[in-house]
Amino acid sequence: MEQKKDKIVLHTCCAICSGYPVSFLQDAGYQVISYFYNPNIYPESEYYKRLEAERTLCSYFGCELVEAEYNPDEYYSAVAGLEDEPEKGKRCDKCFELRLRKTAEFAKANSIKNFTTSIVISPHKNFAKLTAIGEKIANEYSLNYAAIDFKKKDGFLKTNKIS
C-alpha cells in the first residue's frame, strides 16, 4: 500500500519558474498542486501563453493544475497609488502579497496545510522578502509556508533546462 503524500500548493507564475520547484517538491515526497494566479500579467495574450505552458508542464509532471480566474482589476486595486514605485519596491510587495494570499486562501479552503511559491527561483526576486510575506500570511491562515530557496544548488539553471 502506497503511503499518502502531504499536499502542497505551489503558486506558479510561469512554466519556466515552476519546472524545478515542481520536480524538487515531488522528489521531497509532496503531492504538488500548481496554483496559477497571476492578475499582474499583461497583456492578456501573455497571460494565456504562460497558462498554456503551465498546463503542458503539469501534464508532463503529472501534477494537478488549478487555474484561478484572470482578473487584472484585482491587481490594479491592490497596487493603487503605487504606480510610480520602482521595480522591487512597494508595488512588487503588494503584488506578491496578493498572489500568496490567494494561494493561502485556496489551500485553506481545500484543507491543504502547506503552500509556497515558484517566484523565489528568480535571481531577481528577494527570497527573504518573499519568505516574510509568505510566513505572515501563513500565520493568518494557520498554514505552513514552505520557505524553500529554489535558487540554491543551481535551481535557476535547472528550471531553465526543464522548461
PLM feature segments, named:
Residues 1-163:
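Nucleotide-activated chemistry modules centered on ATP-dependent adenylation/adenylyltransferase
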